[in-house]
Curated annotation (Swiss-Prot):
Keywords: Activator, Host cell membrane, Host membrane, Membrane, Phosphoprotein, Transcription, Transcription regulation, Virion, Virion tegument. Pfam families: Herpes_UL46 (PF03387). It comes from Human herpesvirus 1 (strain F). Interacts with VP16. Interacts with host LCK, PIK3R1, SHC1 AND GRB2; these interactions promote the activation of the PI3K/AKT pathway. Interacts with host YWHAB. Interacts with ICP0; this interaction targets UL46 for degradation by the proteasome. This is Tegument protein UL46. Residues 456-467, 475-488 have a biased composition (Low complexity).
Length: 715
């Protein structure tokens, strides 16, 4: 008799390959279920989820490792009110000793400098030429200034980037004494490290959610922006001191130096007032201690440089004057570049946490200080626009885009905080007028248009001749060295803002001047997805439901949806998206609601020819995959600590977002294994032999009962 091995049966093998209901003969409707149930066409929510996942992956690739680590996500999730402890920021600084936070910007800047090669001698001569042009507009007439050398180049790109990136200085010995020169080099090296620490602090201080306000982040932003205004006051004093020294060298006679702006305030007074009356010094908050220490370190290096400029002995002759001018421009370029980082980072995304957002008084004061400094010192110091800076930096803009997209996917609509900022930007944008730019104003040096050409062609040719009547102006550069479109002067409407992602885009309206000292060229406000018909102040409770439920209640998923405001040909509808409602807004809202409801529920003309009617017993076209899951992050808190706020996160299992710590909730520890029941042991007869034990008491009771019965019988 042959013994059959288990598992070798043909029936068992068939069951592994064929559904059980087909084997039993019940195959009614199985093909339809397999076809329509197995259809893998992505749902709209799945597509949005995949797009947000791609944004998150792109953002994570551009960030330092500490910003996306699990430990930082867990520590931020345990905080309330979207706050960031300063200890976490300090940990971020310690984790980035090689300045990985700015690697993309440094790479783009190095590539731009490589396309416009200038030797140290050429750059020094070009800086000196720009300085003579500046000095003629500052000092009264009667001062003999050397003539411009023929065929010199435009040093704007190198002045903007080289002092910050190049380790070697152009003017290594600007002082006669060797000890003073060594002190100058050491102070500049320490200043660079101190400026990097402040930039790192700003980079790592961002909370986890940009759609909600953050109190401590707003305080830190106020401190940083107030610190920018202090930097420009110090820079004005440094340039004033250099001008005074150069004028004395050019005219040794007792000619009185009368600058147009007057004598600026001494740096010691400016620094002391900021440390005593600055935003972080007057609030008494303990969440800015490391920031105040970093600011004090920078101000200490600036004080040492100011003392060297005021008391250091310079070399005589032409070389002494050249070294004085070049060293001043180098140091001020480092500080100016650092101030641009803070301002442009605020405009790129950090402004969502600022007090009053873009109407922040410290932001306005910082931009005004930069504008005044660039106007006074033109054409020495160029200024980079915020879109150009964001295209070079990459990581900050990518992070804000991914974070806001994830919040928009979870909630289905922008938060009230985020939407208020968009309304503010849109309301200011409606006051701007557009006009065709003159052809000569839209061209940069060498006749090239501001949006095209290469950096090498733009900066390697001869410098453009400036008219003697208006004062010279400093160019504004894009990341490749292209001059940016100028800003409208005060009192005139500014042009509409182009898209920051389009390097060839030119605004339709330029200023009435050929070039300006400063350009504030922001981005077009991002378009909002379609909201509920009711306004943001009358938002229905259904807005908190999952997106599938809300969209199913509003109509079929295959209805066309309008994303963003109306096209530009309908300005009234576009303005109504963001502007404040007028007196007749209630009546208009009711009429719009009724019209949109009729249009939404009305059948389309071609519905019958396109779609088939699915009967009730036919089954669904595709199987809905549950996409919304709710995670509650329960953190262990002490008895005195406030409970951590739970957060909700959407997840589609079909389109995995990956193991990113900023998307996935922190893993919960596995529950302890269940304890096995202990065996019931025999009960120990405790106190059985003692006088009051249970055994002796029972025996005594029985003995007394027996004696009573025997006594009765004996009677």
């Amino acid at each position: 008799m042959q013994r059959r091995t288990r598992g070798a049966s043909s029936l068992r093998l068939a069951r592994c390959l064929t559904p059980a209901n087909l084997i039993r003969g019940d195959n009614a409707g199985v093909p339809e279920r397999r076809i329509f149930g197995g259809c893998l066409l992505p749902t709209p929510e799945g597509l949005l989820s995949a797009a947000v996942g791609a944004l998150r992956q792109r953002s994570d690739d551009a960030q330092p490792a500490f910003l996306t680590c699990t430990d930082r996500s867990v520590r931020l999730a345990a905080r309330q009110h979207n706050t960031v402890p300063e200890s976490l920021i300090v940990d971020g600084l310690a984790s980035d000793p090689h300045y990985e936070y700015i690697r993309h910007y440094a790479s783009a800047a190095t590539q731009a400098l490589g396309e416009v090669e200038l030797t140290g001698g050429q750059l020094s001569r070009a800086i000196l030429t720009q300085y003579w042009k500046y000095l003629q507009t500052v000092v009264p007439s009667g001062l003999d200034v050397p003539e411009d050398p023929v065929g010199d180049c435009d040093p704007s790109l190198h002045v903007l980037l080289r002092p910050t990136l190049a380790p070697k200085l152009l003017a290594r010995t600007p002082f006669k004494s060797g000890a003073a020169a060594a002190k100058y080099a050491a102070t500049v090296a320490g200043l660079r490290d101190a400026l990097h620490r402040i930039q790192q602090y700003m980079f790592f201080m961002r909370p986890a959610d940009p759609s909600r306000p953050s109190t401590d982040t707003a305080l830190r932003l106020n401190e940083l922006l107030a610190y920018v205004s202090v930097l420009y006051r110090w820079a004005s004093w440094m340039l004033w001191t250099t001008d005074k020294h150069v004028c004395h060298r050019l005219s040794p006679s007792n000619r009185r130096f009368l600058p147009l702006g007057g004598s600026p305030e001494a740096p010691a007074e400016t620094f002391a007032r900021h440390l005593d009356r600055g935003p972080s010094g007057t609030t008494g908050s303990m969440q800015c201690m490391a920031l105040r220490a970093a600011v004090s370190d920078v101000l200490g290096h600036l004080t040492r440089l100011a003392n060297l400029w005021q008391t250091g002995k310079r070399s005589g002759g032409t070389y002494g004057t050249v070294d004085t001018v070049v060293s001043t421009v180098e140091v001020l370029s480092i500080v100016h570049h650092h101030a641009q980082y803070i301002i442009n980072a605020t405009l790129t995304g950090y402004g969502v946490w600022a007090t009053d957002s873009l109407n922040n008084e410290y932001l306005r004061a910082a931009v005004d200080s930069q504008e005044r400094f660039c106007r006074t010192t033109a054409p020495l110091f160029p200024t980079m626009t915020a879109p150009s800076w964001a295209r070079m930096e990459l990581s900050i803009k990518a992070w804000f885009g991914a974070a806001l997209a994830a919040d928009l996917l979870r909630s289905g609509a922008p938060s009230l905080h985020y939407e208020s900022i968009l309304r503010l930007v849109a309301s200011r944008r409606t006051t701007w007028s557009a006009g065709p730019p003159p052809d000569d104003m839209a061209r940069g040096p060498g006749g090239h248009r501001a949006g095209g050409g290469t950096v090498g062609k733009r900066f390697s040719g001869p410098a453009r001749q400036r008219a003697p009547a208006p004062p010279p102006t400093s160019p504004t550069l894009d990341p490749r060295g292209h001059p940016a479109v100028p800003e409208a002067p005060r009192g005139r409407p500014a042009p509409p803002l182009p898209d920051a992602d389009d390097p060839v885009a030119e605004p339709p309206g330029c200023a009435a001047q050929p070039a300006t000292y400063y350009t504030h060229m922001g981005e077009v406000p991002p378009r909002l997805p379609a909201r509920n018909v009711a306004g943001p102040d009358r938002r229905p409770p259904a807005a908190t439901c999952p997106l599938l439920v809300r969209r199913a209640s509003l109509g079929s998923l295959d209805r066309p949806r309008g994303w963003g405001p109306a096209p530009e040909g309908e300005p009234d509808q576009m303005e109504a998206t963001y502007l404040t409602a007028d007196d007749d807004d209630d009546a208009r809202r009711k009429a719009t609601h009724a019209a949109s409801a009729r249009e939404r529920h009305a059948p389309y003309e071609d519905d019958e020819s396109i779609y088939e009617t699915v009967s009730e017993d036919g089954g669904r076209v595709y199987e809905e995959i549950p996409w919304m899951r709710v995670y509650e992050n329960v953190c262990a808190n002490t008895a005195n600590a406030a409970p951590a706020s739970p957060y909700i996160e959407a997840e589609n299992p079909l389109y995995d977002w990956g193991g990113s710590a900023l998307f996935s909730p922190p893993p919960r520890p596995p529950p302890p294994p269940p304890l096995s029941p202990s065996p019931v042991l025999a009960r120990h007869r405790a106190n059985a032999l003692t006088n009051d034990g249970p055994t002796n008491v029972a025996a005594l009771s029985a003995l007394l009962t027996k004696l009573k019965r025997e006594g009765r019988r004996s009677r």
